[in-house]
């Protein structure tokens, strides 16, 4: 029996790893162990419940206003005992979080093979996104299995000198998750509030956007909403108190913008599927929305997902207020521009990434 341990801590990681947990649990020759760090406790629990995943270990590192130093040292100090107790054959981590980096580092110290899900994404600017770009590059040095979501991600890894025999193009597990969560008969009170209007979904939380960039983003969104009475915007706000303070000060009193608590993954994916367009600084939404045929304006200066830009499903608009305003306004007023983005092809997979990863691990772990 092969022991495969999956470690994750944030909501976006959980959305992409829980389908893989459930796929691995169907394999008779694999013992699946789940460890969560609890970095975003409330938001993480929502996803675990939606996918009916019960962690075997919980490091419970969550505390208010913790720094990267706190997160790094807490995970490193606590994951060691779990790894030594479980003695897994392979540890799977996802993407670019601090949990991913620190877990991979601990595995390196203990000489445990690491499988990197969503490997090979790059901006090649270690401060954008921060600290994610450094995290994922560092994990690629350590990883024995590199599960790249696209051919471009594979090419990035090859350019960096990774052994081709360790790289597998699987598609993105985010697309697998949508098969479970999006439902035709879904209803929600906030969707009833937006009924009859074009629904705009907003997400914004990135560390590098805190402060003035986020203020610019929210001012642009408010201007457009105030000028277009036929739209309503919903913003499931992040738990970060700094984000909440900025959002409340700029968007809080606008009758066409509803700030709500974080949605669980089932709710969130169904909100996305019923939206007209999406403004975000998230990484995962850049993959999920194109699968649903929704245009995405990416409020970041860089993206590690250029496939979506190239395909035309995403547009990188940065954090400048006027640029966001003009692009948001165009998609509301220019039907051809909207149609071009909403009908572009999805470059992120077919919904069978988890099966491919499990097949590889079953044969090679």
Predicted regions and their residues:
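Nucleotide-activated sugar donor-binding and catalytic core shared by glycosyltransferases
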Residues: 1-235, 240-365
């Amino acid at each position: 029996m092969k022991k495969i341990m999956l470690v994750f801590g944030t909501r976006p990681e959980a959305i992409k790893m829980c389908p893989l947990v459930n796929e691995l649990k169907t394999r008779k020759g694999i013992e699946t162990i789940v460890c969560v760090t609890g970095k975003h406790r409330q938001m993480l629990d929502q996803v675990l419940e939606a996918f009916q995943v019960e962690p075997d270990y919980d490091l419970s590192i969550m505390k208010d206003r913790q720094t990267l130093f706190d997160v790094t040292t807490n995970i490193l100090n606590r994951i060691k005992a779990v790894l030594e107790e479980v003695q897994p054959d392979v540890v799977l981590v996802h993407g670019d979080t601090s949990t991913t980096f620190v877990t991979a580092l601990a595995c390196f110290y203990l000489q445990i093979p690491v499988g990197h899900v969503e490997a090979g994404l790059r901006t090649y600017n270690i401060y954008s996104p921060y600290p994610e770009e450094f995290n994922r590059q560092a994990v690629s040095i350590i990883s024995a299995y590199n599960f790249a979501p696209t051919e471009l991600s594979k090419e990035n890894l090859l350019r960096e000198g990774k052994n081709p025999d360790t790289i597998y193009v699987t598609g993105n597990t985010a697309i697998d998750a949508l098969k479970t969560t999006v439902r035709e008969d879904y209803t929600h009170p906030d969707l009833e509030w937006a009924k009859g209007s074009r629904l705009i979904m907003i997400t914004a939380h990135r560390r590098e956007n805190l402060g003035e960039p986020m203020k610019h983003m929210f001012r642009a969104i408010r201007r457009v909403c105030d000028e277009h009475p036929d739209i309503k915007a919903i913003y499931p706000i992040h738990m970060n108190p700094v984000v909440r303070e900025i959002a409340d000060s700029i968007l809080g009193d606008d009758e066409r913008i509803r700030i709500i608590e974080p949605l669980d993954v089932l709710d969130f994916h169904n909100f996305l599927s019923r939206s007209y367009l999406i403004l975000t600084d998230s990484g995962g939404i850049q993959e999920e929305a194109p699968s649903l045929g929704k245009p995405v304006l990416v409020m970041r200066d860089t993206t590690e997902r250029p496939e979506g830009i190239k395909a035309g499903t995403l547009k990188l608009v940065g954090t400048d207020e006027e640029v966001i305003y003009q692009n948001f306004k165009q998609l509301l007023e220019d039907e051809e521009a909207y149609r071009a983005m909403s009908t572009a092809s999805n470059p992120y997979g077919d919904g069978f990434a988890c099966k491919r990863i499990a097949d590889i691990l079953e044969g090679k772990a």
